[in-house]
Amino acid sequence: MTFLAILFVIAVLLLLAQLPVIGFYIRAVYFGMCLIIGGFLGGLASIPFGKSPNNHFRMFKIFQAMTWPMGVRFELRNSEILHDKKPYIIIANHQSALDVLGMSFAWPVDCVVMLKSSLKYLPGFNLCAYLCDSVYINRFSKEKALKTVDTTLHEIVTKKRKVWIYPEGTRNAEPELLPFKKGAFILAKQAKIPIVPCVFSSHKFFYSHAEKRLTSGNCIIDILPEVDSSKFDSIDDLSAHCRKIMQAHREKLDAEAANLNI
């Protein structure tokens, strides 16, 4: 009887999911649950290994498997650039929570992510983030943010870590990238390491919070050649250059993605 009841609930949810707005909320809640449960299970699986950036891969495998039914597919290009063993800063455009899924396909070894401090309170996810040695930054306190930069710099130098940063600092669904925050570029200049730009094509073809739309779709992830931070006289020049090449490439990828999502 219980089994039949479960089947009935699943059938009802599948039918409701066909209605655009209701389907959006069902898929959004499902994605959120995948993030929490995937993080928790990935965290549990990582406990025997202690804190390590490479624990990310356990969570990512679980998360990718759980979200597969959603039908959002990612095509990774130029992944060989990520295989470099030396430390670098990887910067990516940030559009939505779906970026967590996208980054799982482009994640290099020995890499930590810089997260906004509020995420440390997200159940399940916070366990995995702790065991993955993630870095939390307080965007509303300059003093605390600078302290985080100093700590991260020490990790890069002593442990040869790579760091994943979203330089826009917040989600941005618009075609034009937001002005970049300086943290990633300060780190690159002070640590004397390159920056590797990572560009995601627009999610607009399958996701829109404003339109309450979340469907299956395709996203392109392209890894651009590394940028030598030592060749720029100032942090502002380095930031402006990275933003310029990422903006141009984003527009190119969006044109391709439009054809993939017809």
From Swiss-Prot:
The terms under GO molecular function for this entry are: 1-acylglycerol-3-phosphate O-acyltransferase activity
Q: What is its main location?
A: membrane
Query: Where is the short sequence motif HXXXXD motif located?
Result: 94-99
Query: The organism sits in which domain of life?
Result: Eukaryota
Q: Where are the transmembrane segments?
A: 3-23, 29-49, 89-109
Q: How does it sit in the membrane?
A: Multi-pass membrane protein
Listed pathway(s): Phospholipid metabolism; CDP-diacylglycerol biosynthesis; CDP-diacylglycerol from sn-glycerol 3-phosphate: step 2/3
Q: Which GO terms describe its cellular component?
A: endoplasmic reticulum; membrane
Keyword annotations from UniProtKB, A to Z: Acyltransferase, Lipid biosynthesis, Lipid metabolism, Membrane, Phospholipid biosynthesis, Phospholipid metabolism, Transferase, Transmembrane, Transmembrane helix
Any one GO BP annotation for this protein: CDP-diacylglycerol biosynthetic process
Function, as annotated, reads: Converts lysophosphatidic acid (LPA) into phosphatidic acid by incorporating an acyl moiety at the sn-2 position of the glycerol backbone.
According to the UniProt entry, the note on domains is:
The HXXXXD motif is essential for acyltransferase activity and may constitute the binding site for the phosphate moiety of the glycerol-3-phosphate.
The similarity comment for this entry is: Belongs to the 1-acyl-sn-glycerol-3-phosphate acyltransferase family.
Name of the molecule in the record = Putative 1-acyl-sn-glycerol-3-phosphate acyltransferase acl-1
Q: Which organism is it from?
A: Caenorhabditis elegans
